[in-house]
UniProtKB/Swiss-Prot annotation:
It is a single-pass type I membrane protein. Glycans are attached at N90, N97, N145, N196. Residues 26-215 are extracellular. This is Kit ligand. Stimulates the proliferation of mast cells. Able to augment the proliferation of both myeloid and lymphoid hematopoietic progenitors in bone marrow culture. Also mediates cell-cell adhesion. Acts synergistically with other cytokines, probably interleukins. The lineage of its organism: Eukaryota, Metazoa, Chordata, Craniata, Vertebrata.
């Protein structure tokens, strides 16, 4: 019985080991993010609301996928946090803020190192350079939190080319002085061209979804088959040991019956002698 239990436990650990790569397949830099990021709320509360922090903002952060901007954005966050750290004293009143920022700098530096180890080779970068901007603590650390959340689910991009260029046809911000005009009607040829471009972009999107599905299947199927094989081996082992266990129980019962018979015979002899 103990051998059977040991085999079952071994099968369970084997399945956990086989599923381990599946669990860690998401978030290539997830283990670099520590619980120190939770102190951001405390830091924002300690800083003046009108305090301005300089950050070179990466264009397209709000409209492009995370793998398009995360590598460059985290480098700029590292620079800004290091500058902010230098403005706080490592003593007395500034100790709390200094300690929090110092921990955040270490996290960001680890993420920069992780991105250097996992570079995105097939990503076409935008020609626009990061733009220096001034942010309040709330907005700055909002960008910081968005970058951290992106790292938690960041994965290596598929081998297909991934466009990371902001469309030049994106509409500029509306000016309040602009008057309302009649809608502009496209000629039939231009409208047809736009429909073709739209269908092409839809095909690209569907292809990217299919690629991600294939990647997931490539990881999940081996783990599933290993699970089935493991349980099959466990069932065969149990079936093989079951007759032995049955014979052991039967032999034990026979021995107990023989012992009872011998005891009764001894008692009869003693009674006859008396």
């Amino acid at each position: 019985m103990k051998k059977t239990q040991t085999w079952i436990i071994t099968c369970i650990y084997l399945q956990l080991l086989l599923f381990n790569p599946l669990v860690h397949s998401q978030g290539i830099c997830r283990n670099r993010v520590t619980d120190d990021v939770k102190d951001v709320t405390k830091l924002v509360a300690n800083l003046p609301k009108d305090y301005m922090i300089t950050l070179k903002y990466v264009p397209g952060m709000d409209v492009l996928p995370s793998h398009c901007w995360i590598s460059e954005m985290v480098e700029q966050l590292s620079v800004s946090l290091t500058d902010l750290l230098d403005k706080f004293s490592n003593i007395s009143e500034g100790l709390s803020n200094y300690s929090i920022i110092d921990k955040l700098v270490k996290i960001v530096d680890d993420l920069v190192e992780c991105m250097e180890e996992h570079s995105f080779e097939n990503v076409k970068k935008s020609s626009k350079s990061p733009e220096p901007r001034q942010f309040t603590p709330e907005k700055f650390f909002g960008i910081f939190n968005k970058s951290i959340d992106a790292f938690k689910d960041l994965e290596i991009v598929a081998s297909t080319m991934s466009e990371c260029v902001i469309s030049s046809t994106s509409s500029p911000e509306k000016d309040s002085r602009v008057s309302v005009t009649k809608p502009f009607m496209l000629p039939p040829v231009a409208a047809s061209s736009l429909r073709n471009d739209s269908s092409s972009s839809n095909r690209k999107a569907s292809n990217s979804i299919e690629d991600s599905s294939l990647q997931w299947a490539a990881v999940a199927l081996p783990a599933f088959f290993s699970l089935v094989i493991g349980f099959a081996f466990g069932a065969l082992y149990w079936k093989k040991k079951q007759p032995n266990l049955t014979r052991t129980v039967e032999n034990r019962q026979i021995n107990e019956e023989d012992n009872e018979i011998s005891m009764l015979q001894e008692k009869e002899r003693e009674f006859q002698e008396v």
